[in-house]
């Protein structure tokens, strides 16, 4: 063979070898960094070791075991490659399951009152008969108001009564119904059961592309013991040892409630337990079977009722329920923002699910709890980690109404793990706070709420760096600080004005007179009872004009008619002084 033929053959061999190497390198790079659309690898091993142990409990055979340790965070993944297969373990979520001890249905009531006043000593028909309105009697209910109680007030101000030296008496019907037809469910929660849910998936290299061949299979790990061990046996044998503690952030044990039209809208506040009937808390107006009731046959509500009679004959009154909250009295507004704090507003709550059929409420934790994982395999695994990215971020630091100090951050173009550090100024001498956040497998815009210590009370220089990226990739900016005022509990219900129409024959049995026909002219009590708007002041002005006119008319009548008539009847000369003076002047001539 000639020299040039040898040269061509050698060149062809070199080209083939180079192409094969490039092909192998290309496949390897595709697995390591570029082809993670199907899965994401976020955790790096912090330790690897090899030792000998008996893998089979019924065998004395000793084999070589490879152990790999990881620190594992919520929403993150661990990837190990054994031969041509990639095992992916993902920390899916942390669930807190709260058993429901007991429950009841309640409503915020709308209350209306019908009060009648009876003047002492007038009328044979006593509408405020003590036997009829005794405190242990219920009044007639209706389809509109399913609950009704009576209240007898033996001594009230006798305004507009003929006898004002003796107190009048008032009798009231207190009617209740669910406000806007809305009903709520109160539940008592016990201490939670904490479960860590992880998933296992398997990917295999098929013609240079990673394809899912198994999973995801979920495993529920109870954190009560703090340690768990199990095995994965598909394709390869992997022994998993997991150590994790229960999260510190959880709902307190006690009473919660939710609207019946939205079970997952769990709320917290001052709520009566099933054995309580405190009018200062939610849940004192309850449904028992098909009836709506106030505990103790409404005795507490009756005792809380206060009434002021503004006009006994006009049946005008003002009333309120002292020491009672969480109701709507006729003509008043109900402000429920202070009691209706949603559980989902807590920074550690990702979602809420209420399942009354299983008597359980599940909270998916926002932060999770850190775990230490040890994977034992028969062969040494190849480890890989995906690239973390961050395009930009914005945020704010807030001290909210309830005293929670939070860093609210919106991340743009984020994937994987990012490290957050906060400084007093841009010199970055000492970090005031540091944490890590995970954002899963795909590039996205996402937000996060992070609890901060009480030492942070001003604007901060915040720097965020994607995991395992050079320092030049760090993004820093000033984040403003904002304080919101503390919540102020709503004030007790104000007085509400009511009018109870009553026929003359039924109430007080007084004959109609000028005062009844024209109460705005002759009755100041009516004016005081109905308020002092422009119309009432106009009426009182007309009253004054008429009174002045009547006074002038009486003066004229007295001086021009009554006095001369009296003088004439008593034979007393009554002559005008001007006439006497004129007569005297004429005699001088």
Swiss-Prot record:
Topology: which residues are Cytoplasmic? 559-589
Q: Which GO terms describe its biological process?
A: regulation of egg-laying behavior; syncytium formation by plasma membrane fusion
Q: Which residues are glycosylated?
A: 58, 138, 205, 335, 382, 392, 408
Annotated Gene Ontology cellular component terms = apical plasma membrane; cell-cell contact zone; intracellular organelle; plasma membrane
Signal peptide boundaries? 1-20
All ranges on the Extracellular side of the membrane = 21-537
The membrane topology term of the UniProt record is:
Single-pass type I membrane protein
Protein location: Cell membrane; Apical cell membrane
**Null allele phenotype:** Egg laying defective phenotype. AC fail to fuse in the majority of worms. RNAi-mediated knockdown in a daf-7 e1372 mutant background causes a severe defect in amphid sheath cell fusion induced by entry into dauer stage.
**Family in the record:** Belongs to the EFF/AFF cell fusogen family.
The record ties this protein, via PANTHER family, to:
CELL FUSION PROTEIN AFF-1 (PTHR37415:SF1), EFF-1A (PTHR37415)
In UniProt terms, what function does this protein have?
Required for cell fusion events during development including the fusion of anchor cells (AC), vulval A and vulval D rings, and late epidermal seam cells. Required for amphid sheath cell fusion induced by entry into dauer stage.
- The name of this protein is Cell fusion protein aff-1
């Amino acid at each position: 063979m000639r020299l040039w033929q040898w040269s061509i053959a050698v060149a062809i061999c070199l080209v083939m070898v180079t192409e094969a190497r490039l092909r192998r390198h290309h496949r390897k790079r595709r697995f390591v960094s570029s082809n993670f659309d199907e899965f994401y690898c976020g955790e790096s091993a912090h330790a690897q070791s090899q030792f000998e142990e008996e893998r089979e409990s019924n065998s004395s055979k000793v084999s070589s075991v490879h152990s790999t340790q990881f620190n594992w965070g919520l929403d993150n993944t661990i990837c190990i490659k054994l031969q041509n297969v990639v095992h992916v373990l993902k920390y899916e979520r942390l669930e807190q399951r709260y058993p429901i001890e007991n429950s009841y249905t309640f409503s915020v009531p709308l209350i209306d009152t019908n009060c009648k006043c009876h003047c002492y000593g007038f009328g044979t028909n006593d509408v405020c008969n003590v036997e009829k309105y005794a405190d242990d009697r219920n009044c007639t209910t209706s389809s509109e108001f399913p609950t009704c109680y009576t209240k007898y007030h033996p001594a009230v101000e006798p305004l507009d009564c003929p006898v004002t030296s003796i107190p009048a008496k008032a009798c009231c019907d207190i009617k209740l119904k669910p406000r806007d037809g809305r009903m709520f469910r109160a539940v008592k929660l016990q201490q939670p059961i904490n479960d860590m849910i992880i998933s296992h998936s398997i990917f295999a290299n098929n013609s240079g592309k990673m394809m899912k061949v198994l999973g995801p299979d979920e495993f529920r790990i109870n954190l009560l013991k703090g340690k768990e061990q199990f095995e994965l046996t598909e394709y390869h044998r992997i022994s998993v040892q997991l150590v994790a503690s229960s999260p510190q952030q959880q709902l307190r044990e006690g009473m919660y409630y939710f609207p019946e039209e939205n079970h997952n809208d769990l709320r917290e506040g001052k709520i009566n337990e099933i054995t309580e009937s405190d009018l200062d808390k939610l849940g004192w107006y309850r449904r028992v079977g098909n009836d709506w009731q106030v505990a103790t046959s409404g005795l507490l509500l009756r005792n809380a009722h206060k009434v002021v009679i503004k006009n006994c004959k006009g049946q005008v009154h003002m009333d309120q329920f002292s020491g009672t909250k969480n109701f709507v009295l006729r003509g008043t507004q109900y402000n429920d923002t202070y009691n209706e704090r949603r559980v989902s507003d807590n920074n550690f709550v990702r979602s809420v699910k209420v399942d009354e059929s299983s008597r359980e409420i599940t909270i998916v934790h926002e932060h999770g709890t850190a775990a230490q994982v040890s994977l034992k395999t028969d062969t040494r695994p190849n480890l890989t980690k995906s690239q973390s990215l961050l395009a930009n971020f914005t945020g704010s630091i807030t001290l909210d109404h309830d005293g929670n100090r939070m860093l609210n951050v919106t991340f743009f173009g984020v994937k994987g793990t990012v490290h957050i550090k906060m400084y007093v100024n841009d010199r970055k001498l000492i970090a005031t706070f540091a944490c890590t956040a995970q954002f899963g497998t795909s590039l996205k815009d996402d937000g996060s709420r992070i609890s901060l210590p009480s030492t942070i009370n001003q604007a901060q220089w915040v720097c965020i760096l994607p995991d395992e990226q050079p320092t030049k990739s760090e993004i820093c900016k000033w984040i403003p600080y904002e304080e919101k005022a503390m919540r102020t509990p709503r004030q007790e219900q104000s007085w509400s004005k009511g009018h109870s129409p009553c026929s003359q024959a039924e109430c007080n049995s007084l004959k109609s007179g000028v005062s009844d026909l024209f109460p705005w002219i002759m009755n100041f009590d009516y004016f005081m009872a109905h308020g002092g708007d422009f119309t009432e002041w106009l009426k009182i002005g007309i009253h004054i004009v008429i009174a002045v006119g009547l006074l002038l008319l009486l003066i004229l009548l007295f001086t021009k008619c009554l006095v001369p008539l009296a003088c004439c009847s008593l034979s007393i000369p009554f002559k005008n002084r001007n006439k006497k003076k004129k007569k005297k002047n004429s005699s001088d001539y």
